[in-house]
């Protein structure tokens, strides 16, 4: 029997930061940063969040700064 391919076209993810014209990712803007953190407290990868490489680097730096300053948790509370 022949196997049939499943699936269709996947929708291309949009860079939220570029789409909303955010030029500076501030570590104090926790509401923005929480969009890119999983429920376990880990930083979402580019393939999941859809951010560009440049914005992913900026985002990672901002999240790490916010964690050190105590604005975001390092791990999620259970």
Swiss-Prot record:
Classification via InterPro entries: Ribosomal_bS18 (IPR001648), Ribosomal_bS18_CS (IPR018275), Ribosomal_bS18_sf (IPR036870)
GO terms assigned for molecular function: small ribosomal subunit rRNA binding; structural constituent of ribosome
PROSITE patterns: RIBOSOMAL_S18 (PS00057)
BP-aspect Gene Ontology terms: translation
GO cellular component, one term: cytosolic small ribosomal subunit
Subunit structure: Part of the 30S ribosomal subunit. Forms a tight heterodimer with protein bS6.
Similarity comment text for this entry: Belongs to the bacterial ribosomal protein bS18 family.
Function noted in UniProt: Binds as a heterodimer with protein bS6 to the central domain of the 16S rRNA, where it helps stabilize the platform of the 30S subunit.
Listed PANTHER family: 30S RIBOSOMAL PROTEIN S18, SMALL RIBOSOMAL SUBUNIT PROTEIN BS18M
Name of the protein in question: Small ribosomal subunit protein bS18
Organism from which the protein derives: Pediococcus pentosaceus (strain ATCC 25745 / CCUG 21536 / LMG 10740 / 183-1w)
